[in-house]
From Swiss-Prot:
Record protein name field: Ribonuclease toxin YhaV
Originating organism: Escherichia coli (strain K12)
Assembly and oligomerization: Homohexamer; forms a complex with PrlF (SohA) with stoichiometry PrlF(2)-YhaV(4), possibly as a YhaV(2)-PrlF(2)-YhaV(2) complex like the MazFE complex. This complex is seen to dimerize in solution.
Molecular function GO terms recorded: protein homodimerization activity; ribosomal large subunit binding; RNA endonuclease activity; RNA nuclease activity
BP GO terms, sorted: mRNA catabolic process; negative regulation of cell growth; regulation of DNA-templated transcription; regulation of growth; single-species biofilm formation
Biological role stated in the UniProt entry: Toxic component of a type II toxin-antitoxin (TA) system. Has RNase activity in vitro. Overexpression leads to growth arrest after 30 minutes; these effects are overcome by concomitant expression of antitoxin SohA (PrlF). Massive overexpression is toxic. Unlike most other characterized TA systems degrades rRNA, and co-folding of the both TA proteins is necessary in vitro for inhibition of the RNase activity. It is not known if it has any sequence-specificity. Acts as a transcription factor. The YhaV/PrlF complex binds the prlF-yhaV operon, probably negatively regulating its expression.
E.C. numbers: 3.1.-.-
EC top class, as a word: hydrolase
Length: 154
């Protein structure tokens, strides 16, 4: 999947924080395909990449404002409330995104990997890691800066 692109009427962008994780997953699948072209589809990374595409194309871009994507107070309150998340991969993976209904834009902010699986209370928990990233401003909290950083990479 290349970014930016238009899916279900939404302009879909990837912030560098998401793009880095996504590119690493794509590279892992390409390596698996090169090593074992007959069976790479059975590997966990290949299945995960397929689920990521499905989540983006069939869930996020269909209705980014769905109540199912609200995170409650998992990222704290205040400025982080504008972030949404989708759960997948047996509930262990999270993809965080922001959207603007007015602009019809969705920005994929970050997706956890096998090192940051959802594990409540752990330092490597997806919500804990993403909260720390937001505190450091990468990705940024405000829409204008988020949009600018995203557009600069495309």
């Amino acid at each position: 999947m290349d970014f930016p692109q238009r899916v279900n009427g939404w302009a879909l962008y990837a912030h560098p924080c998401f793009q880095e994780t996504y590119d690493a997953l794509v590279a892992e699948v390409e390596t698996l395909k090169g090593k074992d072209p007959e069976n790479y589809q059975r590997k966990a990374a290949t299945k995960l990449l397929a689920v990521v595409h499905k989540v983006i194309e069939e869930h996020i871009t269909v209705n980014p404002s769905s109540p199912a994507f609200r995170h409650g107070k998992s990222l704290g309150s205040g400025k982080n409330k504008d972030w949404s998340r989708v759960k997948f991969g047996a509930g262990r993976y999270r993809l965080f995104f922001r959207y603007s209904e007015k602009e019809k834009v969705i920005i994929l902010g970050w997706m956890n990997d096998e090192n940051t699986l959802r594990t409540y209370g752990k330092k490597t928990d997806a919500y804990t890691v993403f909260s720390k990233m937001l505190k450091r401003g990468h990705p940024p909290a405000d829409w204008e800066t988020l949009t600018r950083e995203t557009e600069e990479t495309h």
